[in-house]
Amino acid sequence: MTDNELLRLIKMVNQIAENFDNGGAEDEVATQVLDHVNRFWAPSMKFKVARYAESDGSMLSPPSRLAVLLIDQSKKA
């Protein structure tokens, strides 16, 4: 994936978080984002954005970053 693809993924996950944010707790929004990403994103998309969150993550909103960091953990559960 190119940097443009990563930027698109960051934008998408932030939009998903914004759509789920109804004033609830950050971890609740992150759980909904995680569920959406696990259901609808290809493994390569999840891998790319998860590696970004681990290495930097500064362009991710707080609930997006939390959700993305939980991707690997949710597979083990």
Indicate where each model-derived feature is located:
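A domain-level signal for the structural core that forms small-molecule/cofactor-binding pockets
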Residues: 1-77
